[in-house]
Amino acid sequence: MSLGLVGRKCGMTRIFTEDGVSIPVTVVQVEPNKVTQVKTVEKDGYNAIQVTTGFKKRSNVNKPMAGHYAKASVEPGRGLWEFTVDAAAEYQVGSSFDATMFEAGQKVDVRGVSKGKGFQGGVKRHNFATQDATHGNSLSHRVHGSTGQNQTPGRVFKNKKMAGHLGNENVTIQSLEVVRVDAENGLLLLKGGIPGSVGGDIIVTPAVKSW
């Protein structure tokens, strides 16, 4: 993973091009990402930088974390995130990054935690087809049906698509276009939708793929 930014999902809107074309965009608020630690191969076994963003009351920060922030001379943030980099020596503890890291037209990958839906059935979770509404079917309209064979193998295979917990998992959307960068207000406008609820933390990194 290359260096990226941690932001917060604000919601969706749309903007218009000069030709009057409507583009749906997701607004991501990017507060300054401050470097709290630089990890190197010699000391930690790999190159990475650790960043924080946002604000947290000092009364809500425990002593070990307070000491970690104080060592970096950085105000406590709402969390810590890490980005692996090729050359950690290029970064300094206490330095910061903002939305100007990206530019309009650039492709980015966006990671977030999808909305949790709780325990859901196979129809909603895996797009299973429903069974007959009538014609002798009185109870099994939305059940998933058979889950395997008979005595051989006599068990249900792992990862069988069945009812279960839906959502609340890490999701990455690749190659989204940065439509606009509002450096003054610290906003990124990304084309299309991104995972997570409004107010959720989002990680934006340069796209891995070139298409």
From Swiss-Prot:
Annotated positions of the N5-methylglutamine modification: 151
HAMAP family named in the record: Ribosomal_uL3_B
Name under which the protein is recorded: Large ribosomal subunit protein uL3
Provenance organism: Francisella tularensis subsp. tularensis (strain SCHU S4 / Schu 4)
PTM comment text: Methylated by PrmB.
Keyword ATP-binding: no
Top-level taxon of origin: Bacteria
A Gene Ontology molecular function term of the record: structural constituent of ribosome
Role noted for this protein: One of the primary rRNA binding proteins, it binds directly near the 3'-end of the 23S rRNA, where it nucleates assembly of the 50S subunit.
Listed PANTHER family: 50S RIBOSOMAL PROTEIN L3, LARGE RIBOSOMAL SUBUNIT PROTEIN UL3C
Oligomeric form and interacting partners: Part of the 50S ribosomal subunit. Forms a cluster with proteins L14 and L19.
Family of this protein: Belongs to the universal ribosomal protein uL3 family.
PROSITE patterns to which the protein is assigned, alphabetical: RIBOSOMAL_L3
